A protein has these predicted regions:
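Structural detector for short beta-strands of small beta-barrel domains
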Residues: 6, 21-33
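OB-fold/S1-family single-stranded nucleic acid-binding modules
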Residues: 91-111
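Beta-strand/loop nucleic-acid-binding surfaces
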Residues: 53-69
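Short boundary/loop segments of OB/S1/cold-shock single-stranded nucleic-acid-binding domains
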Residues: 2-20
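A structural detector for beta-sheet-dominated domains
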Residues: 9-11, 43-45, 61-63, 84, ...
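Basic/aromatic-rich interaction segments and small domains that mediate binding to polyanionic partners
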Residues: 13, 29-55, 79-91
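Short nucleic-acid-contacting surface segments enriched for D/E, G, S/T with interspersed K/R
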Residues: 67-81
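Amphipathic hydrophobic-ligand
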Residues: 20-25, 63, 79
Length: 111
């Protein structure tokens, strides 16, 4: 699948930009930009931090029931999303932790 460039604006947690060099936007790519996928894993161009945890990918899903992230591909400017990042439990297993909300849009050319 081709890679689709995305720009994710993190609206909450409110101090996200403070922890990430003044930036509240994440840039990255996904190979899952298709209606076939309800959630998209986005590989970030640079790592991000929430609390004391650093991560280099996030999983995004639609914020509202009945909507899909793929509506972004149908000409909508942006869509509201839930944002999860990977964490490890006490047994060392990785899971997706819901910790942020925001919006996603197709990244402008050159970003």
């Amino acid at each position: 699948m081709p890679r689709t460039r995305l720009k994710i604006h993190v609206a909450e947690p409110f101090d996200f930009s403070r922890l990430n060099g003044g930036e509240s936007d994440l840039l990255g790519w996904t190979a899952q930009a298709s209606p076939a996928f309800s959630d998209w894993v986005v590989h970030l161009d640079r790592p991000a931090v929430v609390g004391e945890e650093e991560f280099d990918k996030v999983k995004i899903s639609s914020r509202y029931a009945g909507e899909t992230v793929s509506k972004l591909l149908e000409g909508f400017g942006f869509t509201a999303i839930n944002i999860c990042y990977p964490r490890r439990d006490e047994d060392g297993r990785t899971y997706w932790h819901f910790g942020m909300v925001g919006n996603v849009l197709l990244a402008p050319e050159g970003q």
